Regions:
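Flexible loop/turn segments at secondary-structure boundaries
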Residues: 78, 88-89, 209-213, 224, ...
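Non-catalytic regulatory/linker segments of enzymes
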Residues: 206-209, 403, 519
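A cross-family structural signal marking well-folded subdomains
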Residues: 201, 230-233, 237-449
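Secondary-structure capping and boundary motifs in well-ordered enzyme cores
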Residues: 61-62, 82-87, 192-197, 205-212, ...
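Betabetaalpha-Me/HNH-type nuclease active-site subdomain
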Residues: 50, 54-77, 405-546, 569
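Glycine- and hydrophobic-rich flexible loops that cap the catalytic core of alpha/beta enzyme folds
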Residues: 2-287, 524-525, 547-556, 560-575
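Short helix-capping/linker segments at secondary-structure and domain boundaries
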Residues: 101-105, 224-226, 290, 363-373, ...
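C-terminal, active-site-flanking charged/polar segments
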Residues: 90, 222-246, 252-256, 379-392, ...
Length: 576
């Protein structure tokens, strides 16, 4: 069982301890606190330490809990910070700004305060005197070009007009706030400093290893910036490329890759670089022939054999190529129109599995320029669309989809055609399931089906990936509620009564009779001014064809959608 050292400590107790020799490791992210976070911390501290603007009203036993600091002691005896580096860095800058004000003061309280702050910032000799050449914290953040500025500020207590880093901004912020505080409450100045040192509480958690520390971190509800798996991977790759004398080249490539991924995967719930590594992981899994549907975690997969997969010259090239591919998908460039249409539809898939399949396909089949052969790629996209859509109805849940998809990934890297031969659907059975399925708006497959259907229309134009689309009830719910002319109100949630519609138009159209909806679809305002026209070609055609949409129309349209979908599956050899 892992051993942990957990002991609540004040800032002074933790920072001044001779055992406290902190290291911000190379896999951590650069300092990121901005003025909002700094102001919130400062205001909280002042409110706590000087209650109701009265230093004498402070309870000396009061405590202000700032959060945990998760570390482990590395092979060099330094405490590597896994969680809490943002707040720890901020406290160091705050204390250094305070120290600069006390540096030349000679009254007893100021001398005592200065002495305590010195023990927090610098290592001391056996007599307790600070060695100002040895800070209590060091930084090795690989992608942080400003780390030297951070260490310089701690050493000198000064910034210049040339210093533009977050560290300099934080130091200057605290210096300014301290000056204002001294002007307003000159007699309270030492009190505030001592209460920061002796009444702000941290919870240092020292684990016996990096892995244990990371596991602890993942369970904590952190106020700071979460450490991503990709940060750990960056550390391993940084060491590998440093040993090959390619450190600076690696850092530059990593920064560019990180910037690109932040833009590409802006909608992702996970860290953008984690998203890229996840998509790459499925390629490596396929090459290893892994069919097991119990997918291990991202870090668990890559840490095997001491991160051997990451210690390879080709890794950065593969990641860059994969990011460039998804950038082209996102920007809708570099593909034929028919492939862009398929990719747009897949963007509304009921789950993310398609992105893993397509990533494996790209990495295995790309040419030297990162291009894919048009015809086989289009056929592949067509088939996985039909299969993923059908499986979401036939056997809902992404976990179930792993069973047929993981073997398909292995087929890709073995140069075999993906056919899903063992998982083809019975037409009649699937037809009955689709008719019985409740296509409520809360189910992702509902919008998936509607987008697929819209793009079966050859006149449907390609849409921007960032366009916000809602689900429109063509026969309005309010109309059914007040008119009572639907014999079966469940038809309201039928695929035959739904279509995608731009959010801005949907807000206006939601409660109208179809005659009024027609005008909104076509952009007719009634006052002669033209408004936004829907980009849903089918709705335009419906609006131009009739001034009514009835129960019969719902049923006819539902049958048409379902029959067309089944024909689509048949054309892609997905039916028995």
């Amino acid at each position: 069982m892992s051993k942990l050292n957990i002991d609540q400590k004040t800032v002074l107790d933790l920072f001044s301890s001779k055992k406290s020799d902190f290291l911000i490791p190379d896999y951590q992210r650069p300092y990121a606190w901005e003025e909002d976070e700094l102001a919130a911390l400062w205001d909280d501290i002042v409110t706590f330490a000087i209650p109701h603007d009265n230093a004498e009203g402070f309870d000396k036993d009061a405590e202000y809990f700032l959060g945990p600091i998760v570390t482990f002691r590395n092979s060099e005896g330094k405490l590597e910070i896994i969680d809490g580096q943002q707040r720890l860095t901020t406290l160091m800058l705050l204390l250094r700004a305070y120290y600069s004000r006390f540096e030349n003061m000679q009254d007893p309280k100021s001398i005592a305060t200065r002495g305590d702050i010195e023990k927090c910032l610098w290592k001391t000799d056996e007599f307790g005197s600070p060695d100002k050449d040895q800070l209590k914290i060091d930084s090795e953040v690989a992608s942080d070009g400003d780390k030297k500025e951070f260490l310089s500020i701690l050493e000198t207590g000064e910034t210049t007009s040339q210093n533009k880093s977050r560290y300099a901004q934080a130091f200057n912020f605290f210096a300014e706030r301290i000056n204002k505080f001294i002007d307003a409450y000159p007699s309270f100045t030492p009190h505030l400093a001592m209460r920061i040192l002796k009444n702000i509480i941290l919870l240092p958690i020292e684990a016996e290893s990096q892995k244990t520390a990371l596991q602890i971190f993942s369970t904590l509800n952190d106020r700071g910036l979460p450490l991503a798996d990709a940060d750990i991977f960056k550390s391993q790759m940084y060491k590998y490329f440093s040993d090959k004398q390619q450190k600076d080249v690696f850092i530059d490539r990593w920064k560019k890759l990180e910037t690109r991924c932040t833009d590409i995967f802006r909608k992702s719930r996970s860290n953008p670089m984690d998203e890229l590594f996840t998509r790459y992981m499925y390629y490596e899994r396929a090459k290893q022939g892994i069919r097991d549907t119990t997918t291990e975690g991202l870090r668990d997969f890559f840490e095997k054999d001491s991160y051997s997969l990451l210690k390879d010259d080709r890794i950065m090239g593969d990641l860059e190529a994969l990011a460039n591919f998804w950038n082209r998908v996102d920007s809708q460039e570099g593909f034929s129109n028919r492939i862009l249409r398929r990719l747009f539809v897949l963007g509304y898939a009921p789950n993310r599995m398609w992105t893993f399949l397509v990533s494996v396909y790209f990495l295995h089949n790309r040419d030297k320029e990162g291009q894919l052969a048009e015809v086989p790629f289009y056929d592949f996209l067509e088939r996985i669309t039909g299969f993923i859509w059908s499986y979401a109805i036939f056997r809902p849940g992404v976990n179930a989809l792993r069973t047929p998809v993981y073997p398909a990934m292995i087929e890709i890297v073995n140069n075999q055609e993906v056919t899903f031969e063992d998982y083809r659907f019975n037409r009649e059975s699937l037809q009955n399931q689709i008719h019985a399925y409740q296509f409520t708006n809360g189910r992702p497959i509902t919008k998936s089906m509607l987008i697929w259907w819209a793009f079966q229309n050859p006149n449907q134009q390609l849409l921007d990936n960032d366009l916000k689309l809602d689900i429109e009830h063509i026969y309005a719910k309010k109309r059914a509620q007040f008119s009572g002319d639907l014999s079966d109100t469940s038809l309201l949630e039928s695929l035959g009564n739904k279509a995608f519609l731009e959010k801005r138009i949907n807000v206006r159209a939601s409660d109208y009779q179809f005659a009024a909806k027609r005008a909104l679809y076509r952009g007719d305002s009634g006052d002669g001014k033209k408004r936004e026209v829907t980009k849903n070609q089918e709705l335009i055609e419906l609006a131009n064809k009739s001034d009514e949409f009835t129960e019969t129309d719902i049923k006819i349209r539902e049958d048409k959608i379902i029959d067309s979908f089944l024909d689509y599956l048949a054309s892609n050899r997905l039916l028995k």
